[in-house]
Regions:
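Short acidic capping loops at alpha-helix termini that bridge into adjacent secondary structure
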Residues: 166-168
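Active-site-adjacent loop and "lid" segments of alpha/beta metabolic enzymes
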Residues: 16-30, 49-71, 77-78, 84-86, ...
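Catalytic domains of carbohydrate-active enzymes, especially glycoside hydrolases
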Residues: 29-45, 252
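Extreme N-terminal starter segment of soluble prokaryotic enzymes
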Residues: 1-4
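Short, basic/glycine-rich phosphate-binding loops at helix/coil junctions
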Residues: 11, 46-48
Length: 277
């Protein structure tokens, strides 16, 4: 059965819910709500990785996420830390996180692979080509899914060389990272190129820009004026689109999906699994 990672953003500037859960108690309560809705993992992050986001000092990041991870892990919940920083990863695992989710796949911090290897945690390797401020300048592909798979294979080799066992590795094709518009759909259609590498595969499409672009082309929300930007597509529509992509991913044997709206995705996955039999 496809797992569901519930997103807990303890940030000021995440594109979807920045600032809403900056208070640790609110973040913990939100995490518990996601757990009750069906999340199998809670992915806690203290630094936004949206395009153009400013970097956060690791000490500040740790102040944000460690109290939340400590409390959620103490309740027996599987927790992942969403971080680019080796020091935060190590502190989070010490606080009870079982997975390090690094969207850069070890490229952002040269100490990350050694930290993960020493921690014993599982490691989600994201496909990444550079910092968020210029990621779209790097969105140059001939065959997106094959190139993403090839670059992930390189990251796997680096992780193995650092002492991270294959059984601990999770692959994330990095939807929305250094990929523009239709390239994201190309990667999703070609997920077989990534699952063929033989590792667990995690995808994160939740509320992302390429979904907004597709929904905008389908028609504007009745309550908004045309051309008003990303906000002319409601969160509800984005969550429905996310749930649909999650259901379709079942056919590609994806191990887990990372989402904001766990309940909608839970229902979509239930239908998809019933269809598949």
């Amino acid at each position: 059965v496809t797992g569901i990672w519930g997103i807990v953003n303890v940030t000021t500037d995440s594109f979807s819910d920045g600032g809403r859960y900056l208070d640790p108690d609110r973040a913990i309560a939100h995490g518990l709500e996601l757990r009750d809705a069906g999340a199998t993992v809670l992915d806690v992050g203290g630094e936004s990785t949206r395009p153009g986001a400013e970097r956060v000092d690791p000490a500040v990041e740790e102040q944000r996420v460690i109290p939340v991870i400590t409390e959620l892990a103490a309740r027996g919940i599987a927790v992942s830390v969403d971080t680019l920083n080796a020091s935060t990863a190590a502190a989070a695992v010490g606080a009870g996180a079982r997975i390090v989710n690094d969207v850069s796949g070890g490229l952002a911090d040269p100490d990350m692979l050694a930290a993960v290897a020493a921690s014993g945690a599982d490691y989600a390797i994201g496909h990444w080509r550079g910092p968020s401020d210029d990621m779209y300048a790097r969105a140059d592909y001939l065959r997106p899914s094959r190139e993403v798979a090839g670059e992930l294979r390189e990251r796997i080799g680096e992780a193995a060389a650092a002492g991270i066992a294959p059984s601990r590795i999770i692959l994330d094709p990095g939807i929305g990272f250094a990929k523009a518009g239709a390239q994201n759909w190309d990667v999703l259609r070609g997920l077989g190129d990534i699952t063929a590498l033989g590792y667990r595969v995690l995808i994160g499409t939740s509320r992302k820009r390429f979904l907004v672009e597709t929904l905008r082309a389908a028609g504007a929300d009745p309550s908004t004026s045309p051309g008003s930007g990303a906000d002319d597509v409601s969160v509800e529509r984005r969550d429905l689109a996310t749930a649909v992509t999650s259901a379709l991913a079942v056919r590609h044997d994806v191990w887990a999906v990372r989402v904001h709206d766990v309940a909608a995705t839970r229902d979509a996955l239930a239908i998809a699994h019933a269809w598949e039999g």
